[in-house]
Amino acid sequence: MADLSIQGLCALLHLASPQLPVGGFSYSQGLEAAIEHGLVTDAGTARTWIADALAHGFARCEAPLWLLLRRAWSAGDEGAVHEWNQWFIASRDSREARAETLQMGWSLHSLLRSVPWGGEAFAPRIAQLGALVEGAGLAYPTAFACACAAVDADEDHALLAYGFAWLENQVAAAIKAVPLGQVAGQSLLLALHPLLEQAVCEARRRASEAPPRLDTMLPQWSVLQARHEHQYSRLFRS
């Protein structure tokens, strides 16, 4: 990894913050349905669930796609941005999952448009994000990758920040819905740190292949996300 400046670190901490007003806290990505069906009942089963989603979903599809989007933004390749944005939306195989990424993408675009992120030079990219919002939809990783490119954040550090935000949100959902205590939740998050590093390395390998190797094999995760749409009592929107 390249050296990270203080300014770059602050930008990544800002984007990865749970205080970022994009609504990530309101989604569990199927975890709540897994709890409802008795698959996740304690810290141990929560760790297994999140670790599997990280290794077989995030590392194989979402993270390499994020890298491809980050590289496309840096290269000014609008065609590639559009292609990988559509690819990511298509990879969300339930109504709630698609609604999640589109809502969060819209919210991040609105935020970036309202604050001086990246300075005046960022204005053309804001317009490109707006065109996606008005067109086929803006996926959240597309907007996040654009924000990272605007401040020239190193892609490995930026992907780690993106992944940590995803991981922290999953643990927060487990704390609320299992439920787990705060100490148990932090212990769970700490135990997953090494797996996040492995996921970033796997994503880098997959994104660098020709063609990029993108796949997910999480049928139970997909079924539970679809079942969540009809779950009677729930805290989360996915």
From Swiss-Prot:
Major site of localization recorded for this protein: cytoplasm
Subcellular location field: Cytoplasm
Domain of life: Bacteria
Database matches in InterPro entries: UreF (IPR002639), UreF_sf (IPR038277)
MF-aspect GO terms: nickel cation binding
Assigned keywords, A-Z: Chaperone, Cytoplasm, Nickel insertion
Cellular component, GO annotation: cytoplasm
Function of the protein: Required for maturation of urease via the functional incorporation of the urease nickel metallocenter.
Family membership noted in the UniProt record: Belongs to the UreF family.
PANTHER family, sorted: UREASE ACCESSORY PROTEIN F
Subunit structure: UreD, UreF and UreG form a complex that acts as a GTP-hydrolysis-dependent molecular chaperone, activating the urease apoprotein by helping to assemble the nickel containing metallocenter of UreC. The UreE protein probably delivers the nickel.
Name of the protein this chain belongs to: Urease accessory protein UreF
Name of the gene: ureF
